[in-house]
Each structure stands twice: as structure tokens, then as C-alpha cells.
Amino acid sequence: MYGTSREAARCERWGTIPSRGRCCLKLMPMFSPHGPTLRELTVQALSSVERGYDLLAPKFDHTPFRTPDAVLDAVEGELKGMGSFAHGLDLCCGTGAGTDVLRTVCRESVTGVDFSAGMLSVARARVRSDGPPHVAWVRGDARALPFGPVFDLAVSFGAFGHFLPRELPGLFAEVHSVLRPGGRFVFPIGAPPSPASPWYWALLGFDTAMRVRNALWRPSFVMYYRTFRFGDVRRELTRAGFTVEHRALTDFGHRPDGSPRCRLIVATRT
């Protein structure tokens, strides 16, 4: 396990992931001076998901909502071990952090798709476009992907909280439809924090606040942290036509019960 026993205990207490000798606090409320202000976050939260991310896009990479480099690096290492891919899709690509990962494992093309024009604009500016592989950006809804079965690999990082549980069957069916036979859908999923962890109650409080907000305010802003559960994900992927395996991302260690703190889901289109 990475880090000292004291660090591991601290990470277990807070429900976080030890990484390279430090805790990987993806969702802790820590913002750089270049990040959004509280007022800007409030305006975003009272907007639709699409409009909210358009507003947040210029400062998104300076928030803790961006997938940590430690997670991106771990997934990249696993993908390289699976071999080389021709065409890759970054689902809900945001500012392109996952697209950078795909550029290292795909030979011919990489496509980032997102429904926020603002996030795509930032992605175009920050991700290298000189190929190979060729990099393309598409504005579109992950629930109605504008592609045929052309991809060998699809990845997604940190976006599933924007989909309600009832939307997962349709979402996974869409991904299945754009993969070639044998194509893989790969993404990390973290273990939930223990109820003894303050982080468990912080996430519960956040999700509860969002449910109240969505009951009282329109348009809704779907963003929940406790709805994407491992068992539900595995079941719905199987129903969508995938063969599902999961691997421990060993860089992040294990919980006291021996289960991995972070898993990599590898779903293969059959």
C-alpha cells in the first residue's frame, strides 16, 4: 500500500485515495486562486448542467472536480498493458484530460464528445492536435451519440454523476452501439467511503442538497456522488451486451476489509 500506515488511516477516515505518498482529494473543497469564486459556483449551480459547465469551463482545470493526474496516469498504464488501439472515444470529455490519455494509446484517431460548448472550446485550446493520432471534437449528448460502430476503445472520467440511475441502461447501450465487436469501454470507479468517515456524510449532504435544489428550482442540475454504485454498474453493463471485468488499481491501495480503493472497469463489447 502506498504511504505510511498513518496516511492510510487518514485516507480511510476521510474516504480518500492514497496516491504516490499523499491523499488524492478529488472532491475536497480546495480551489486555487485561479479557480471559480463562490459566487461563480452559485450561478453555475442554479443553471442547467450544460449552461453551468459553459460558465465553469475557463476555470474548470483549477477546481478539484477535474480528475486527478494520479488517476489518469494509473488508467493510462493499464490501457498500455492492454495493447494498442486504433480509434478512441473520450465520453463526456470536458476539457480533454481523458483525451490526453487516449492520445498515448490510440494509433489513428481520438474523438472527444461533450455537450458543453464551453468545455470543448477549452479542450481544443489545451490538447495537442498534431497527429497521429488525429484529434477531433464533437458536441453531442452521450445519451444519443452521433457515431456508428467505429471505436475500439471508449473511456470516461468523472462524468457519471451527471446521469440518473434510470439513464444508465440507455447510456451504456449508446456506448455499446459505437464500439466495434471486441471494443472496450474502460473507466475507473472509486470505493464508497465508510459511514465512519466524515467524507461519507459530506457526500450525503451534498447529494441531499442537490435533491432539494432540483425539487425547488428549474432547470435541474443533475450532479450526484452516491448514485453510481459498482453492483448497479456491472449489472447494467452486462444487460447492455458487455462482458465485464474489473481490476484493482493497486497504486491506490486497499481498504481495511481488503477491497481495492479504486477499480478499473473493463467492459468488452461481445
Predicted regions and their residues:
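Class I SAM-dependent methyltransferase SAM/SAH-binding core
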Residues: 89, 95-144
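Core SAM-dependent methyltransferase catalytic element
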Residues: 255-270
